[in-house]
Amino acid sequence: MSDRLPMETTYLVHDALRRELRQLAAVATRGDGTLRGVLRGAAGWKLLRRALRVHHGAEDAALWPVLRHALAGRPYDLALLEAMEAEHTAIGSLIGAVDEALAEPSTDPVLLGDLVDALVTGVGGHLRHEEESTFPLVQAVVTAQQWERFQQVHARRIAADADRLLPWLLDGADERTATAVLAPLPAPVRRAYRERWRPAYAALDRWGPGTPVPAPAPTPVPTPTPAQAPT
């Protein structure tokens, strides 16, 4: 049976996060002592950090409360939701710890490497946990209107950084997926994506010298409305 709710873009966000986690892990395992120097100026770290905060913030604000109400009287499922919330908190704390370590010149490189490893492992495990355990609950109890509301909240949070997060999201996406994401957006936004945002993103060496950068998918503009912006 097919899913009731359209979650393709949510999976696309997860895939993009996994792509960046692989890049972050590659930087951390180079073993040449450059981790702090690379991450301090890495656009990839800033994009990963921002994408996690946008995505998790939208879930905390507009998805978990809906699930908590719908799952009242189901202690096992509520315990799963509490685990999701705890994982978000832990990931946020790890991001903060990495940033603090990057800001301190005397940070032990081993400590920084351990923090990055914990973040890569923690986010990867959270994405898997969410897809395997929480998404089926979302499909079972969240209404189409509630899901649309979550998408709108997510859209508002991403809109301010659409010039970077949209090409980041579509990096490596196939043509069908990219077309589906872009089609609902206003024409000026699609044009800005094609003519400015995607070329600027493609020119970034997101993770610094010596780190492979995935090939990207082959001034102000109107901000997309919440219903139109990607989730």
Locate predicted features.
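Small-residue-biased structural context
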Residues: M1-T231
